[in-house]
Amino acid sequence: MSQLTHINAAGEAHMVDVSAKAETVREARAEAFVTMRSETLAMIIDGRHHKGDVFATARIVGIQAAKRTWDLIPLCHPLMLSKVEVNLQAEPEHNRVRIETLCRLTGKTGVEMEALTAASVAALTIYDMCKAVQKDMVIGPVRLLAKSGGKSGDFKVEADD
């Protein structure tokens, strides 16, 4: 079984030393969902929200969140991301918004946390912008879809049925 990399022999949390690692291209994709009433989703799709374009705002906030992950999660390294992508898609058949993020860099540590943070904070932004019309929206699940690069190898979730 793998060991927890952020816990030392004394059981103390610490930031992993990546100075000896080779720089490789690393990429991660994550997703999050925000489920809401059909009327709330229609308001977003039709651009009738009084606060403005919900998707455009969530996209920009998600990008900013990926870039600030190190500031939110203390044991994450500050990274020079080369790409952050945040895509939002309305899924009216499920009364929800799907958020998919992609983060990429050439570096010594992975970008899974950045992709997950981008998806999570974009979802929180949708909630924040729409809470005046619906407070019982549900955020989740949030999950890593895939990662590549680095010593631990590639990961990809199994296709959903």
From Swiss-Prot:
Pathway assignment: Cofactor biosynthesis; molybdopterin biosynthesis
Query: Which amino acid positions bind substrate, per UniProt?
Result: 75-77, 113-114
Question: Where's the active site on this chain?
Answer: 128
Q: Which GO terms describe its molecular function?
A: cyclic pyranopterin monophosphate synthase activity
Task: Report the InterPro entries cross-referenced here.
Answer: MoaC, MoaC_bact/euk, MoaC_sf, MoCo_biosynth_MoaA/MoaC, Mopterin_CF_biosynth-C_dom
State its Enzyme Commission number(s). Answer: 4.6.1.17
Q: Name one GO biological process term.
A: Mo-molybdopterin cofactor biosynthetic process
The record's top EC class is lyase
Q: How does it assemble?
A: Homohexamer; trimer of dimers.
Function, as annotated, reads: Catalyzes the conversion of (8S)-3',8-cyclo-7,8-dihydroguanosine 5'-triphosphate to cyclic pyranopterin monophosphate (cPMP).
Which family does the UniProt entry place this protein in?
Belongs to the MoaC family.
Which protein is depicted? Cyclic pyranopterin monophosphate synthase
Species of origin? Shigella sonnei (strain Ss046)
Q: What is the lineage of its organism?
A: Bacteria, Pseudomonadati, Pseudomonadota, Gammaproteobacteria, Enterobacterales
Gene behind the chain? moaC
